[in-house]
A protein has these predicted regions:
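Short N-proximal segments of mature Sec-exported proteins
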Residues: 2-55
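Compact alpha-helical subdomains of small soluble proteins
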Residues: 35-114
Length: 114
């Protein structure tokens, strides 16, 4: 469960950073960009906090994060809306209510065990 949540944080950090950069380039309102960057900061902090709990060295966390950013950047260049559709709502929920996502992974894990 914790490893899956940590992967979600990496994905959401990457999503928020790319979204903020895309919105900057598109000339969107500063308030929207600031919100995306704040969400990126929150997910990065939780990513690293959880990585430490899991015993993951900082250089490994950085490498995984960079890899995910590169992956999402490639997707966003082709079709940003598909990236937003896949991660936007999930990441918003993760930032607003972590317990909901933990419950999701626990339920999914329980289905596999049964």
């Amino acid at each position: 469960v914790l490893e899956n949540i940590q992967k979600d944080y990496v994905a959401c950090y990457s999503f928020y950073k790319i979204a903020a950069e895309s919105f900057k380039k598109a000339g969107k309102k500063k308030q929207i960009i600031d919100g995306l960057e704040k969400s990126a900061d929150v997910t990065l902090k939780f990513n690293h906090d959880l990585g430490e709990v899991l015993g993951m060295p900082p250089q490994i966390m950085t490498k995984k994060t960079k890899k995910k950013i590169d992956e999402f950047t490639a997707i966003a260049k082709k079709d940003f809306s598909s990236l937003a559709n896949q991660y936007g709502l999930m990441c918003k929920k993760l930032v607003e209510n972590q317990k909901q996502r933990i419950d999701y992974w626990e339920a999914k894990g329980n289905k596999i065990i049964k």
